[in-house]
Design a protein with these regions (language model features):
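Membrane-targeting and insertion segments and their boundary/processing signals
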Residues: 53-56, 70, 78
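Catalytic pocket-lining loop regions of alpha/beta-barrel enzymes
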Residues: 1-65
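Residue-level detector of alpha-helical recognition elements and their boundaries
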Residues: 37, 49, 67-70, 101, ...
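Mid-to-C-terminal alpha-helical segments outside catalytic/metal-binding sites
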Residues: 60-63, 76-112
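Conserved, mostly hydrophobic/aromatic
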Residues: 13, 34, 69, 96, ...
């Protein structure tokens, strides 16, 4: 059904502990995008952090969006945690730009 509909789906919090399940869905459905809010700050140092990095590497960075989850996570802390995560897992400059702002810009302009 995800391939039949044109409606964009923005999956929040990267699916949390189900990030690998979400990745499998998103790989098959070009209308599914994944937001990183909350999950990176919450799961720092866990196996889920590694699963998120694996999922981004597996899918590519084009449908992953930065999200702060403000006010539940302080905006500055969220940006800091996300940038540390991206650096720690060896993401390239263009992948970081995609995740941090380009994909969000493209998503909201494409589906306005």
């Amino acid at each position: 059904i995800l391939n039949v509909i044109d409606t964009p789906i923005l999956a929040l919090h990267a699916g949390g502990k189900r990030v690998l399940d979400l990745m499998l869905i998103a790989e098959q459905s070009s209308n599914v995008y994944i937001d990183l809010s909350f999950s990176l700050s919450y799961y720092i140092g866990s196996s889920i952090e590694n699963d998120i990095a694996f999922s981004i590497n597996k899918m590519g960075s084009k449908r992953w969006l930065y999200g702060s989850d403000h006010p539940y996570v302080d905006m500055n802390l969220s940006i800091k945690n996300t940038m540390k995560f991206l650096d720690r897992h060896g993401f390239k400059k263009n992948e970081i730009e995609n995740i941090m702002y380009k994909n969000g810009y493209d998503f909201f302009n494409k589906y306005k």
